[in-house]
Every structure is written in structure tokens, then in C-alpha cells.
Amino acid sequence: QGKVNTDQPLTVASLAGIVLDDEQAVLTGSWQRSMSTKSYIGSGYQHDSDQGKGDKTALFQTPAGLDGEYEVRFAFTPGSNRTKTLPVTVSHAAGKTTIIIDQTVVPPIKNRLISLGRFLFKASERAQVLVETTATTGHAIIDAVQFLTVAEADEQTQIAKGVRDEKRTAAELKELKSQLEKLTARQPQRQLVMSVQEEEEIGDTS
């Protein structure tokens, strides 16, 4: 069973690179729009209602050709009723590559995106990502596709690493503070006993 994702929606404009929202996909078959799971990109996402398997597809394609190597990321909202075997095919300069996605698991990037890999593209051809529902069980979800240059992808990875490091440091400091408070509470209170010593009287000298 996938984790419940409580994140709020992200705007397309807040993401780097070229982002194609589900509204821009060329669809075959009947897809259902939804905003039930809030971790979507744009104005919502779509699902196949767990019906009509094999008859429904979604094609994401860039407005123009891409020149060079790009990292391709696929966005979806996870859930326990999602498919574990969604085939997503990237068409690139060297041919086609199909990746099988488990949509019950929270995506690792921003809790929304999963990397499909890095591929070379030709400037003369539009990049395409095809989502199929053949042989899937459970709801198939489409939300967005992101294309990042290698430099953009590496930068995003470093930013994410920095955020993770900050969170880890904060968590470690919190844990150390908690341990210190526990140790302090365990120490017995030592009573300070103060005594007054009488000064020796100095007699008169003869």
C-alpha cells in the first residue's frame, strides 16, 4: 500500500525545464479528471477509472524538437488503488524505451515526479512520451511530463540534496537536544551544604 501524500498542488510555472501538463496530452479513450489527491501539478490530474484497459492512451509531445541530452520525468499522484505496472514509453534519437512505473509508491522527486532516464533527442523531431493502460490493474494516473537539460537536472538534484541535508541536520540537532534534556533530568540534584566556620578569636597580646 502506498503512502498517503498530503502535499499541496504545484503550478507548472514553478517547475524548471519544459513541463507538459495532462491537459496538453493527446488522449484516446475516456479519461476522468480529478483533484482528490492534492499532490498534483497544474489544475489536476486524470485517471482511467480502472476501466477500458488497452483502449486508453495519453501522448505527451513537445511543441518543437529537443536538441541534445535531456532527463525526462513523469508526474503522478500515488495511492493504494493505483496500478503497479504502468508502461510509459519515451521516443528518443536512439529509438524507444519503456519504463514500468509502480503508482502505489510516492514518487522520489518532490513527491510528484519520477525520472524515466536521460535520453538524446533530435532537433528535427518532437520528443514524445506515451502512456498506455494495456495489462494494468488499478487506476492509471497521468499528471505531467518534465524535460530537463542535463545541467538543469543536476542543479535540481543538488538543490534537493541541500534541502535533505538541512532537514537531516535539523533532525539531528533536535535529537541531540532531546538526549541532553533526558540526561539532565536523570542526574540527581546535589544538595549544597554550606557551613559557617567560627573565626578563631585572637587574644590580646601582652
What are these regions (language model features)?
Residues 1-16, 104, 115-117, 135-206:
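Substrate/cofactor-recognition hotspot
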Residues 11-38:
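Predominantly extracellular/luminal regions of secreted and cell-surface proteins
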Residues 43-64:
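Short beta-strands within extracellular/lumenal beta-sheet-rich domains
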Residues 58, 62-80, 145:
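A short beta-strand element within beta-rich, extracytoplasmic domains
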Residues 69, 83-87, 126, 142:
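Exposed beta-strand and adjacent loop surfaces of beta-rich binding modules
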Residues 70-74, 116, 125-134, 145:
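Extracellular beta-strand-rich recognition modules
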Residues 79-98:
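Short, surface-exposed beta-strand/strand-loop-strand elements in extracellular ectodomains
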Residues 93-124:
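Extracellular carbohydrate recognition and processing domains
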